[in-house]
């Protein structure tokens, strides 16, 4: 049954803030839900099939609730609310983005941008070992680094240790030209990039020089006990089973460890089993350890990245067997 419904908002400015004053976002809503949207002054008119109008109204209600909670609604927030309603998810936009991580008094807090990101932050708060597993661009490493910096600022830990396997060099760094820093920097640059977004340049330089923040390849963790530290292992899908066991057994007193990886992007030789795959199976029932899985819905890079990941997943999935 076709229906026309008008929603009234407190002011034209309040209404415009719900779609970032970008009429293209309303066109996205029309195309996604199959409704006609007309907006003037402080009202919006929805026309279409009743259940589709219900969904469109729910999108605006989600956005309005988030606005009243102080959320600055931009393109990502609008599209997230639209996608959640389109897929009949139960995420509340305002609740999701209320999860904030403060890393610097001079930089805005980092905000969770999906339900899984929120669950990930909460898991890190509550557990000493957390696995964050999913595709690129879902914020696994970025949020882990933010939580580590926040913990350091609050003096909950004395240092941050960021590590990843230099699988491209087979971790045989001694064969590469240059001093240690020159050898390892290319493999660790994504971790440095995350730090630069959260710390002032002088603050980051001071922390690195004092080794309050240490960025090192996984091979350099062997034989150490990592006390009073926030440890992040990035690109964990490229650890061997021996390397993963080695790192997890380095964790000392008053320490946290976050392990991030994408099990669809394993670059190890065919005869090597990924350490993170084994760990996920072996540790799934161990108290104090949590695992959060991300999907393409959590991608916060360019909007095309989500579509690219989905297309590749569909392309790589085995075709159903034909019936004879």
Features from the language model and the residues they span:
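Short glycine-/aliphatic-rich beta-strand segments at the starts of folded cytosolic domains
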Residues: 1-16
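Flexible glycine-/small-residue-rich
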Residues: 9-11, 39-41, 48, 164, ...
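Interdomain "pre-motor" coupling segment immediately N-terminal to P-loop NTPase/helicase cores
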Residues: 38-97
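Short amphipathic alpha-helix segments
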Residues: 14-31
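Conserved helicase motor core of SF1/SF2 NTP-dependent helicases
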Residues: 105-115, 123-233, 237-324
């Amino acid at each position: 049954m076709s229906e026309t419904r008008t929603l009234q908002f407190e002011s034209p400015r309040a209404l415009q803030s719900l779609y970032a004053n970008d009429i293209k976002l309303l066109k996205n809503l029309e195309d996604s839900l199959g409704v006609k949207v007309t907006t003037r002054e402080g009202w919006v008119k929805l026309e279409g099939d009743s259940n589709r109008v219900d969904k469109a109204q729910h999108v605006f209600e989600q956005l309005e609730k988030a606005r009243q909670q102080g959320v600055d609604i931009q393109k990502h927030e609008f599209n997230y609310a639209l996608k959640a309603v389109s897929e009949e998810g139960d995420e509340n936009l305002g609740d999701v983005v209320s999860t904030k991580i403060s890393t610097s008094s001079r930089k805005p807090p980092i905000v969770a941008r999906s339900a899984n990101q929120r669950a990930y932050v909460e898991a890190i708060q509550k557990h000493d070992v957390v696995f964050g597993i999913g595709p690129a661009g879902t914020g696994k490493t970025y949020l882990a680094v933010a939580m580590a910096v926040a913990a350091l600022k609050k003096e909950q830990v004395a240092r941050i240790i960021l590590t990843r396997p230099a699988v491209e060099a087979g971790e045989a760094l001694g064969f590469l030209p240059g001093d240690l820093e020159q050898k390892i920097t290319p493999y660790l640059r994504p971790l440095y990039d995350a730090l630069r977004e959260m710390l002032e340049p002088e603050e980051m330089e001071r922390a690195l020089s004092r080794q309050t923040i240490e960025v090192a390849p996984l091979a350099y963790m062997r034989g150490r006990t990592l006390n009073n530290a926030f440890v992040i292992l990035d690109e964990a899908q490229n650890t061997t089973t021996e390397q993963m066991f080695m790192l997890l057994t380095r964790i000392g007193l008053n320490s946290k460890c976050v392990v991030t990886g994408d099990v669809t992007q394993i670059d190890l030789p065919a005869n090597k089993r990924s350490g993170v795959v084994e760990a996920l199976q072996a540790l799934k029932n161990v108290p104090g350890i949590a695992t959060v899985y991300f999907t393409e819905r959590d991608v916060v890079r360019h909007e095309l990245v989500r579509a690219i990941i989905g297309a590749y997943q569909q392309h790589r999935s085995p075709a159903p067997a034909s019936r004879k």
